[in-house]
UniProtKB/Swiss-Prot annotation:
F-type ATPases have 2 components, CF(1) - the catalytic core - and CF(0) - the membrane proton channel. CF(1) has five subunits: alpha(3), beta(3), gamma(1), delta(1), epsilon(1). CF(0) has three main subunits: a, b and c. It is found in: Cell inner membrane. It comes from Cupriavidus necator (strain ATCC 17699 / DSM 428 / KCTC 22496 / NCIMB 10442 / H16 / Stanier 337). Produces ATP from ADP in the presence of a proton gradient across the membrane. This is ATP synthase epsilon chain. Gene3D superfamilies: ATP synthase delta/epsilon subunit, C-terminal domain (1.20.5.440), F0F1 ATP synthase delta/epsilon subunit, N-terminal (2.60.15.10). HAMAP family: ATP_synth_epsil_bac (MF_00530). GO terms for molecular function: ATP binding; proton-transporting ATP synthase activity, rotational mechanism.
């Protein structure tokens, strides 16, 4: 079966690099599905789970807090603002981040504070959704 090279990187490290049969991730306009031979594409991605179906049929999950996706017919590159392997996600930390963002929204003193709080809340909610999705897979 045809495969595509997938690289998921953040400023801190390379999180995943390998061949895959399929990649799904959250785009600005909804979920994107990438197969080998996909038309070239560059787009922004939203916070959420990147699902990589590897050659052997197993799945790898990586949480991204947004970033850029570049697709070429034989190569997919995810340049993530922040990327965390699915197994390394910390539910307690995500719950605390969500609570802190909600509190910041209640106590915001400017439009900038509100925008930052909304962004932090979106990332925390996406992390919690990714954790829930991983639990369903197990």
């Amino acid at each position: 079966m045809a495969t595509i090279l997938v690289d998921v990187v953040s400023a801190e490290a390379s999180i995943f690099s390998g061949q895959a049969k399929f990649v799904a991730l959250p785009g600005e306009s909804g979920e994107l599905g990438i197969l080998p031979g996909h038309t070239p594409l560059i787009t922004r991605i939203q916070p959420g789970a990147v699902r990589i179906e590897k050659e052997d049929g197993s799945e790898e999950f990586v949480f991204v807090a947004g970033g850029i996706l570049e697709v070429q017919p034989k190569h997919v590159t995810v340049l993530a603002d922040t990327a965390i392997r699915g197994g390394d996600l910390d539910e307690a930390k995500a719950q605390e981040a969500k609570r802190a963002a909600e509190e910041l929204m209640q106590n915001q003193s400017s439009d900038l504070d509100l925008a930052r709080a909304q962004s932090e809340l979106a990332v925390a909610a996406a992390q919690l959704a990714a954790i829930a999705r991983l639990r369903r897979k197990k």
